[in-house]
Amino acid sequence: MLKGIHKYLLMCFGTVLFTVQANAARIMSNNPIKEDWQCKVVDGEWSCKRAKKPKSVFDKKLTKTEKEKALADDLAWVKKPSYFVGGYYSNDNQFTKALCESKKTDLSYEKSEFDNYGTLIASGNVQVLQCDQELYGNNAIINLNSNNSAIRSLVMAGDVIVKQPSTGIVIRTTELDADMNNGTYSTGEAYFRLAREMPKTRIYDKEHFSGYLRGYAKTFKKESSGDIVLSDGYITSGDPYDNAWKITGNNIDIDTNTHMAYVKNGYFEIQDIPVMYIPYFSHPIDDRRRSGFLYPGFVQNANSGIGISVPYYFNLAPNYDLMLQSVIWSQRGIIENGTFRYMTKYFQGQFEGSLVPYDFKEGKMRGSFTLSTTGQYENINTNFKYEYVSDQNYYNDFSAGNVNLVTKTLLDREFDLTYTNDYVDSGLTVLDYGVVNPLLTVDNTPYAKLPEVKLNLTSDGYTPDYLTLSAQTLNTFFYKTAGPANTNPGAPQGTNVNAFRAYESPKIAFNFNKTWGYLNPSLEVPIRYYQLKNSPTDTIQFANSSVTSVLPIFNIDAGAYFDKDYTNENGTYTSTLHPRLFYTYIPYQDQTNIPLFDTSLQNEQYMQMFQVNRFTGYDRINNANQLTYAIEASTTNQDNGTTLASAKIGQMAYFADRKVNLCQGNSACPNPGLMDPFSTDTFSPIMSSFEFQVMKNIYLSAQVNYRVNQQNVDYQVYQLSYKDENENIFNVSYNNIANNWNSLTQQQIAEGAKPQPQETITLSTVLNITDHWGIAALWNYNFQQKQIANIFAGLQYNAKSWAVRALWQKTAYTNQDPNNPTLLGPLVNTYMFEFELKGLGGIGNTSDISSRLQQINGYQVGEWGNGI
C-alpha cells in the first residue's frame, strides 16, 4: 500500500512535532531494553532508533531459541537470573508521563511525504507518543485533523509495537490500523501481554510470577466499547521463554466492562500438545467477582467414593452472590450444594445448604444446611446461627475428611442481641443444640438457654481513676430435653433438672497504679438464686426446689516493676523484673445442692493462679484462703517491640483445704477426694511459663508444673518452632498432662470419674527444598491410646507458570463414641489433588488442602499458593 502511493507524494525530510520541545524524560538510559534503541540529540531534538535491528518474531525462519529471544525483546521482558521466573516485564511510562500533563502528541520519524490531501506518509523509526500510549513502527500513513494539530487516524506497518503503561498492555504486530479519536484499533498477526492482578502470596510475588498473561492472535481488535477480540490465538501466564501450557481458541473475547475472558472452541495444551478439548471457557482477568463456571474439583471419601464437582458462580449484585455446585459421587449419586451470601448496610450473612435427592446406598433423601447472619447498628449487635443435618452419618459421608464436620456431635442454634457502650454491657441470648448422634446421653448434652439476659454496669468515667464500682447480672432459664440415661445399649430415656438461675454480683475495686507498681484490692459479693424444676426421671435428684447462695470474694493484687535499659551491637533492650502477689479469701459453702449447668474445672496452669475461682461458669465458687507469689522477667527489643525472652514462675500457698468440688445432688461421688487428690495440700505445684528466642528464627516455649510433695512434673507442654525468611517451618510439640480435667464429660463428672492423663507428640514441617519442590507433613501420636491420631504428607511442584500439589492424610477421628470424645477410631485415608495454572486459578479443592496446612503451627494462608 505504501509503495503504490509514493508517486503522488511530495518528498520532505525531518520531524513533525505537536508537543513542546523534547525533554530529558525521553532519555533512554532508564529504558530496560536500551540495547535495542539508541537516542541522541539532532538539531536540538531527540532522535531515537534501534542500535541494531532485531530479528522479527514473525520470521518463519527463526529457530525456537531465536523466536523466544525476539518475543522477549518485543514484550519488554527484562532478564534477571536471580528471579525464579528469570526476569520481569518492564512497564515504564517515562516517555508519556509529561504528555499527560500537556495533553499533546509527540510524532517523530526519519523521512516523510505529504499527498495532495494532507496525508502524511512517514518512514524510518516512526514514533507516536501520547498520554499513556506509545506506538512504534517502521512506516506509517497518518491522517491529521483539519489544522494539523493532532492525529485523526493512522496505519502503521513493519515491526509495530503498541504500549499502554497504565494497564501494562504491550502488543507486537505486523500492522496496525488505529482510530485515534475513539481509541479503536485492529492488527494483523500479533503477540501481546496483559497485566493480571495477583494475590500477594509466596508463589505469586514478583520473583515467582510475572503478574501477566501473554498470548498470540491472528488478528487483535479493540472495539469502541473497549472490548478486545482475538481470533485463532492462545493465552498463557508463562514468560516469553516458558511455553509449558496454553489455552487456545478460535475466538477469544476479553470484555473490559465485566473484566472477563471468554474462550470458544479451543484446547488446553501442554508443551504445545493438546491434552483436553475446551468448547467454552471463561475466567476473570482481575480479582473481581464474576458469574461463570469455576474449576472442577476432585474429592475422595472412603464412604462415598470419588466425587467430581462442577461449580457455577452467580455474581447477582455487588452485595449478594450465589454459588451452586453439583457433585457426582461414584457410590452415592448427585449432591447439590449451594451458598448464598449477602451484605447490607446493617447486616451480612450466608446460607449454606446441600441436598442429596436420592442416596443410592441409603435409598433416601439426605441433606444439611447452615444459616448464619450478623448485624450492627451503632452500639447494637446481633448474631444468628442455625444448623441442620438429616442424619448422624451425613457429615462423615460427604465432608471429604474435614475433621471439624466428621467429629461434630452438636448443631448450633443461637440468637444474640447485645447493646454496649462505655458503661453498659447488656444482651439477650437464646441458645439451643441439635444432637447429631442420638446415642449422646442426656448428661452429655449441653443445656439450652431459653433465654439468657445479661446486664453489666461499670462506673468508669464517673468515679475517680482509683475507684471502680461495677455490677454483673445474668439471668438464665436452663432447659434440656430427654435423652438416653446412660451409655448402655437400649438405655431408657432420662432427663436433667431444668431450672432458672439468677446471678447478681456487685463489686468495688480500688486501683492504685504507679509506673513502678500497683496495689489493687477488691471486694465482690456473688448472689445466686436457683429455682429447680425436679422430675422423677432426672438422672440426678436434688432435695430442694430452690437454692440461694451468697459468698463474698476478697482479693488483693499487688506487684512492682524493675526496669533496666541497655544497648549492644544488636539494638536497645529493656529488661523487666515483675514480682507479684495475689491473695484471695472466699469462705466455704456446701454447693452440692446446686446442679452443674455451665461449670467445669480447669487444668492448673500459670495464669490460673491469678484467678479468684478455679471453676468455669457460675455454679461453683471455690473456698479460698490462699496466696500466690510469683516473679516474671522479660527482655524486650525497644526498636521493634519483640520479646526475646520471657520467664514466669510462681506457686500458691493454701491456708485452708479446698472443699468445693463438682459433686451434685445424689450423683455418684462416693469419695470426692478421688476427684481432687491434692485438695488438702499446703502448696500448689510450682507453675512456670517460658518463651525464648533461642537464636534467629528458632523459638522455644514451655509450660511446666512441678509438684513438690510428689516430686514429679504433672503438667508439661513444650513447643520448639523454626520459621525462616523462605517460609520453611519446623515444629516439635509435646504435652504430658497427668490429670486432664478438660477431657471429662458431664456424665463422667456426675459419676465421680477421675480425670485421665494425656500424652501426645506432634511433628510438623513445611519445607521449600528448592524454588520448585516443597513438602508439608504432620505426624501426631497419642501415647495413651498407643496409636497415630493424625498424619498427612503433601508435595508441591512449583513451576514458572503452573503448580501441582498432592496431599495424603490418614486420620483417626474421635466420632466413634459421642460420650467419649477422646476415643480414637480406626485410621481413615483421604486424598487431595490440585493443579494450578498461575494467573487462571486451579483444578481441585483448595480449601481441603488449605485446611490441612493450617494445622501446622506458623503456616499462613497463601504461602503455598492462591487460597492455599
From Swiss-Prot:
UniProt xrefs under Pfam families: LptD (PF04453), LptD_N (PF03968)
Localization per record: Cell outer membrane
Major localisation: membrane
GO biological process, one term: Gram-negative-bacterium-type cell outer membrane assembly
Signal sequence region: 1-24
InterPro entries, per database record: LipoPS_assembly_LptD, LptD, LptD_C, OstA-like_N
HAMAP family: LPS_assembly_LptD
Main function: Together with LptE, is involved in the assembly of lipopolysaccharide (LPS) at the surface of the outer membrane.
The protein's name in its UniProt record: LPS-assembly protein LptD
Lineage, highest ranks first: Bacteria, Pseudomonadati, Pseudomonadota, Gammaproteobacteria, Thiotrichales
Gene that encodes the chain: lptD
